């Protein structure tokens, strides 16, 4: 998916983990995934922004995933993954403007909004596409989740 900027399945996979497992498991997997990709692709000051944004969005996704109407509706979960993608971009922008001392948050944020939209749209599509695969790979967690409903 290199030809479409900011569209990767990692966020959607992490949201699936956040929905299906404990919050601590999801955060640990997110931390290791983020550090692994940053070691491979390049680490810099943006790593801290990514870590903060990913942590906040995973916590929100995990908490909202407990709401009964969201818990039972994949489309709503995917839509919330879309919103978390937009929130991720907002948090990154806020931290980057502060870190690099850019004069205008609004100008910086608006410049990256299209990329945030691509990321959010990728979350939506990948969440819906990966759900059945994720369910087959981790059937035990779904059986436990259905028992606890």
Language model features by range: what are they?
Residues 9-26, 60-64:
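Generic transmembrane alpha-helix motif of multi-pass integral membrane proteins
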Residues 20-21, 39, 121:
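Transmembrane helix irregularities
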Residues 47-48, 70-149:
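Membrane-embedded alpha-helical hairpins and interfacial helices in multi-pass inner-membrane proteins
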Residues 3, 16, 59, 63, ...:
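Membrane-interface helix caps of multi-pass small-molecule transporters
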Residues 26-38, 76-85:
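Central hydrophobic cores of alpha-helical transmembrane segments
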Residues 10-12, 30, 89-90:
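A generic alpha-helix surface/boundary motif
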Residues 1-9, 31-65:
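Interfacial aromatic-anchored transmembrane helix boundaries in multi-pass membrane proteins
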